[in-house]
């Protein structure tokens, strides 16, 4: 018969063997089984379900048998004091559990803690690399954007990923494409051209913008096609020379010594007003669009008012050439249309005659038109 003192001692030994785990205490029936039954598993098995006592979860059969033998030694020992058996049994349980295998509950806690530490370490490493990558991207892209430079991050189940900076900065890195060039003009300081651009995906005319030529490096093909459709890009230096020479000749004409016989304030005022209008017309040309429509369209409009000579019906002016100075013999006439535009008829050295918008003449043969104006100027 198991005494209550012995039962308490057995339970205290098993509880002390695992400080982090509190198994159900032995019952009197279980304790008696451990004494009366000599099998290697009877004493520490639960009689309810036939499984090992919870204090021994996680131990192998040999280890459980070793503890069983210690319990038998304590219960039926023929040598040594009760205290010696007590210490021996307690030490055996502690030794086996600490050096061999931990209880399943402790093993699960340990594995959970290990996974948590690995996950925490992985998250910190990912956040560090992500922050460094975002910082590097920010320094590079004050717009340009190379999101593909970042190394791919391996997937990990159960991990809550941080949003990539690439998706957040998608709008800031959006690229704008030029759909077409609508018009062009010379800059006021004469340093180059400006182009009137229509942007792809923006159909509202208010979205069209004027941009300097040096800012249009991304649409050089459109610029080349634009000038090709207009007979070639005008020479900037010739336009500047034309502007200066026209302004100078206008100023000279306005201050020509007047004839003493017709010395009136009205005539002086008229000459100055006419020369000022001519200068303003050149200035307006420089500041305004060089081509409000293509040269071919202008040519068709001009031919409505003035037909070329029959001998020039099949003649095609060399619009691809930058200058016509060596090809044109002279400017024959200059006329003004109903809409205020000036057109000039020129004679080519090969004998052909053709009519063109005065702006084209300024671009292609400015010296010829100056010679015409000088030949027809009248002093009063």
Swiss-Prot record:
A single GO BP: subtelomeric heterochromatin formation
Cellular localization per UniProt: Nucleus
Broad class of the protein's primary localization: nucleus
Domain Chromo as annotated: residue spans: 176-238
SUPFAM superfamilies: Chromo domain-like (SSF54160)
Region Disordered, annotated ranges: 14-58, 100-156, 250-273
Biased composition annotated in UniProt, kind: Low complexity: 121-140
Start-end of Acidic residues biased regions: 108-119
PANTHER family hit by this protein: CHROMOBOX PROTEIN (PTHR22812)
Function noted in UniProt: Component of the kinetochore which plays a role in stabilizing microtubules and so allowing accurate chromosome segregation.
Name of protein: Chromo domain-containing protein 2
Organism: Schizosaccharomyces pombe (strain 972 / ATCC 24843)
Origin organism lineage: Eukaryota, Fungi, Dikarya, Ascomycota, Taphrinomycotina
């Amino acid at each position: 018969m198991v005494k209550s003192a012995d039962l308490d001692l057995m339970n205290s030994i098993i509880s002390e063997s695992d400080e982090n785990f509190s198994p159900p205490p032995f019952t009197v029936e279980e304790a008696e089984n451990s004494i009366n039954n000599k099998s290697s598993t009877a004493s520490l098995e639960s009689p309810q379900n036939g499984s090992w006592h919870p204090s021994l979860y996680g131990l192998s059969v040999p280890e459980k048998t070793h503890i069983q033998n210690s319990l038998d030694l304590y219960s039926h020992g023929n040598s040594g004091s009760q205290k010696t058996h007590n210490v021996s049994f307690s030490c055996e349980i502690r030794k086996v559990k600490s050096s061999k295998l931990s209880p399943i509950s402790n093993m699960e806690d340990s594995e959970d803690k290990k996974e948590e530490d690995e996950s925490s370490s992985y998250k910190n490493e990912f956040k560090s690399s992500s922050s460094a990558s975002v910082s590097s991207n920010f320094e590079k892209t004050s717009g340009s954007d190379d999101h593909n430079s970042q190394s791919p991050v391996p997937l990990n189940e159960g991990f809550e990923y941080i949003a990539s900076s690439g998706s957040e900065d998608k709008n800031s890195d959006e690229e704008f494409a030029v759909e077409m060039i609508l018009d062009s003009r010379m800059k006021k300081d004469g340093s180059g051209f400006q182009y009137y651009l229509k942007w792809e995906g923006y159909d509202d005319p208010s979205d069209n913008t004027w941009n300097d030529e040096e800012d249009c490096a991304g649409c050089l093909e459109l610029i080349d096609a634009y000038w090709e459709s207009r007979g070639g890009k005008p020479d900037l230096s010739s336009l500047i020379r034309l502007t200066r020479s026209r302004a100078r000749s206008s100023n000279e004409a306005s201050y020509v010594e007047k004839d003493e016989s017709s010395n009136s304030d009205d005539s002086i005022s008229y000459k100055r007003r006419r020369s000022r209008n001519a200068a303003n017309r050149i200035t307006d040309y420089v500041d305004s669009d060089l081509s409000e429509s293509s040269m071919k369209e202008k040519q068709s409009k001009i031919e409505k008012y003035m037909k070329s000579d029959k001998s020039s019906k099949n003649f095609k002016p060399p619009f691809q050439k930058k200058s016509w100075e060596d090809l044109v013999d002279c400017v024959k006439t200059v006329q003004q249309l109903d809409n205020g535009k000036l057109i000039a008829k020129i004679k080519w050295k090969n004998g052909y005659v053709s009519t063109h918008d005065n702006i084209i003449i300024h671009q292609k043969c400015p010296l010829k038109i100056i010679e015409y104006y000088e030949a027809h100027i009248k002093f009063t």
